Structure formats: C-alpha cells, structure tokens
Amino acid sequence: MNGSLTGSGLFTDLYELTMLSAYHAEAVDDLATFELWVRELPQDRNFLVVAGLQEVVDHLLALQFDDGDLSYLRSLEMFTPEFLDHLRDLRFTGDLWAMPEGNIAFAGEPLLRVRARRIEAQLVETFLLATVTFETMIATKAARVALASGARPFADFSARRAHGAAAAVQVARAAFIGGAAS
C-alpha cells in the first residue's frame, strides 16, 4: 500500500472489489454511467455548495494498484491471479462531468457523472461518494456561516480539530470554497 490514498485502488469497499472480480470473471466490459446526486436536503437547508472535484480529478488521473496493494489483495485469498493481473494494469479511462466547485446545487441535481468501462466506474464509486459528499458538506456549512456572519470574515481553524493533516487540508480547501477567509 502506498503512503497516500490519492490514486490508490484500495480506496474502495471490499464489496466493490468483489463486484469487479465478478465482472472480470464474466467478461463484463460494457460502458456504464453513474451519477452522484442528493435525494433530498435536510429541513431548513435549501442548497449545497459543490466541492471535492479537484481531489476527484487528482484521484482519477493517478488511479492504480501498486505492488503493495496487490500483495495485500493476494493475501486475502479471495481473488484469482488473473484478476489481480488485470488490476495491475487498470487505469481510469472514462469521462467525468461535474458541476464546478463553488456552484450552488439543489436536491435532485447530479453533482457529477462518470461514464466509463463498468469495472472502472464501479471501482471509483466509493472514493467519489466519500470525497464529494464530505467536501460539499463542509463547503455548504461554510457558506451558511458566511451568510450568517454578513460582511465579517471568518476562519475555519480546521487543523485544530481535523482527523489528521490530510483531512485538515481537505476541510480548509472546502471551507474556502464555501466562503471562509482562511
């Protein structure tokens, strides 16, 4: 496993990997389209501020399984050698459409859409959900604070309470997109 999760094929659920294995075994290689959208907003919330796209793009461009990832998957004794060889060569080759970061979105609107070979689209689902929903939540909260504070600037102080350095940077960036001064 590499030190960063950006681009790691292991940033997914085991369920997703078992689905990929089944697709590989059955030679399922069709194109699939997946959308990420919010069904409904909580009461007293009427908009979202989209964030997380830059991290998604970075992940998709760097996506791969390194030797450590494959060694770990091999140790699970759940996957065939042929499937693991397939993962070694797997790269994201699909298309991504997304609302630009900082845009306002409403319930029922797609925040992003992926069109790719089914195995690629399935693999990135967990990362997309985790990243876009988290960063959009932070950006939206920051926008609500900005609206409540009027013209007074506010800071996010994410490094003090975040769960690690990477999370602090992720929160600070999303808060800035939502209106934090720093």
Can you say where each PLM-predicted feature lies in the sequence?
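N-terminal, Lys/Arg-enriched amphipathic/low-complexity engagement segments
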Residues: 28-88, 97
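Buried, small/hydrophobic-residue-enriched core segments of structured protein domains
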Residues: 2-31, 40-42, 78, 84-93, ...
